[in-house]
């Protein structure tokens, strides 16, 4: 069992099995490019707190692989988040967004999918006003601009007549 050292942006070093670290396409490519080395692989876009959570996620999914399904079909489903992943994503918003950024940077598609699905579920069925409140977004549209946008997009509003 070969170990790899990863260094977070705040200079904390983590040792992890190479096979688990390579769940990240970014890390896998770095290992292939620089070869085996005792020097830690720098991850300047990921803090130690977030890297620790990402590595926990990777360890779990290495030990308990998800069944392979129809990826295209599963990508579009928002209600099929496995229990471990659902619990993993029960974090405060800033942490959830940091996990999304880390999953994207590290190229860990399953983690990116589950964190993005979690955000999608947070806004599903919400009005623009509710979404602004959830994410603390200031409404910088004038009432006239809002009305214009509503008129331009009324074709896509749910009229409740399904």
Swiss-Prot record:
Subunit organization: Multiprotein complex (SCF) with cullin and F-box-containing protein. Capable of undergoing aggregation.
Stored Gene3D superfamilies: Potassium Channel Kv1.1, Chain A (3.30.710.10)
Keywords associated with the record: Acetylation, Cytoplasm, Glycoprotein, Hydroxylation, Nucleus, Ubl conjugation pathway
Post-translational modification: O-linked glycan consists of linear Gal-Gal-Fuc-Gal-GlcNAc.
Gene transcribed to yield this protein: fpaB-1
GO molecular function: cullin family protein binding; F-box domain binding; identical protein binding; WD40-repeat domain binding
Cell compartments where the protein resides: Cytoplasm; Nucleus
Gene Ontology terms: biological process: protein ubiquitination; SCF-dependent proteasomal ubiquitin-dependent protein catabolic process; sorocarp development
The organism of origin for this protein: Dictyostelium discoideum
4-hydroxyproline found at: 143
Protein name in the entry: SCF ubiquitin ligase complex protein SKP1b
Residues bearing carbohydrate: 143
CDD domains the UniProt entry points to: BTB_POZ_SKP1
């Amino acid at each position: 069992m070969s170990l790899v050292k990863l260094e977070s942006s705040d200079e904390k070093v983590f040792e992890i099995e190479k096979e688990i670290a390579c769940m990240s396409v970014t890390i896998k490519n770095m290992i292939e490019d620089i070869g085996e080395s005792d020097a830690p692989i720098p991850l300047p876009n990921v803090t130690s707190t977030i890297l620790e959570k990402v590595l926990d996620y990777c360890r779990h999914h290495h030990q308990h692989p998800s069944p392979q399904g129809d990826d295209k079909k599963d990508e579009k489903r928002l209600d099929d988040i496995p229990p471990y992943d659902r619990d993993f994503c029960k974090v405060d918003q800033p942490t959830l967004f940091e996990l999304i950024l880390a999953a994207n940077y590290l190229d860990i598609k399953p983690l990116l999918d589950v964190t993005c699905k979690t955000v999608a579920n947070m806004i599903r069925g919400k009005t623009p006003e509710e979404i602004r409140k959830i994410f603390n977004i200031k409404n910088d549209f004038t009432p006239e601009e809002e009305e214009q946008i509503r008129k331009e997009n009324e074709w896509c509003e749910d009229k409740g007549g399904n």
